[in-house]
């Protein structure tokens, strides 16, 4: 059921214990972005990947890393990964785009980002033919046993999350490597 035209989920259960689990701040940010976008019919797969899957806004803290206020020379360019929709442990982002009434259901498209979404690209996959052949970028490589696209995205993510000194250091990331005003993130 999607009374507002969309269904948003993070990683907590609506059926489980209230206030138990993670993802509440991320869910609130998703809903804050989706509600007006739904009302103005802005939601497209491209919009979802740009505005949600690659969001670096924490509404509880009132910050948006993409504002430019967290880049050099204003800061060091490093930040703590805390309750952004995109986070280090995110393994993929998927949008399923259905078909209109009367269209062939085999044309349903699964827009897929494998690996860390800010470091990956979107690849479409269709129901028709999916069982025979996935794009080579998405499919598991027989030699490495990894998806080439996911492997590359994880490598790029690890460059950004490269600080390893001390307990909790895995949460620090070089924001400048992901987003900067020069457009070279």
Task: Indicate residue ranges for each PLM-predicted region.
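C-terminus-biased signal that marks the final domain/tail of proteins
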Residues: 1-185
